[in-house]
């Protein structure tokens, strides 16, 4: 499905959630003639007002349910195919500190390899890595300096989604 907006028009994309939702959605915001690209993430409150949480300048993103996702030939699979190039693991290390803003959390996340910001229950959190198993997260945690914040391993969530740069394991 394609959509084209007129110049300087925002296109809103909603994602279905629940048991009948797709496992993954790939989005491309390609713009070679106009200024502006990327995505703004957020939600609609009870008054149907958009509440922004974060933004990215990436042109191609993939939104996946929070479970292990296997990338093969540019497609995300829920079950492991015979050959795959990348895995987006659903196990992460999460710092125990809540941050007051996306920018504050991002500054800390960028100090860790594969660090990223998560928005959990109204709080900005820093997560590190996207591992395929609890044991892999535990191994990485034992090798990661988190003394200033403390950390725990978090497992896949039935209500979470992961936004990654398409065809990579970058969250």
Predicted regions mapped to residue ranges:
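Conserved, single-site charged/polar hotspot
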Residues: 1-171
């Amino acid at each position: 499905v394609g959509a084209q907006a007129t110049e300087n028009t925002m296109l809103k994309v909603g994602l279905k959630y629940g048991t009948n939702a797709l496992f993954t959605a790939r989005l491309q915001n390609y713009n070679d003639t106009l200024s502006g690209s990327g995505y703004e993430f957020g939600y609609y409150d009870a008054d149907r007002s958009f509440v922004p949480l974060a933004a990215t300048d990436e042109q191609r993103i993939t939104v996946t349910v929070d479970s292990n996702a296997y990338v093969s030939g540019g497609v995300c699979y829920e079950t492991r195919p015979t050959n795959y190039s990348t895995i987006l693991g659903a196990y992460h290390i999460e710092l125990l500190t809540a941050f007051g803003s996306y920018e504050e959390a991002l500054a800390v996340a960028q100090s860790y390899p594969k660090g990223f910001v998560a928005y959990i229950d109204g709080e900005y959190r820093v997560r590190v890595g996207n591992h395929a198993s609890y044991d892999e997260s535990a191994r990485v945690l034992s090798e990661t300096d988190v003394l200033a914040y403390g950390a725990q391993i978090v497992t896949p969530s039935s209500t979470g989604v992961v936004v990654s740069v398409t065809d990579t394991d970058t969250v």
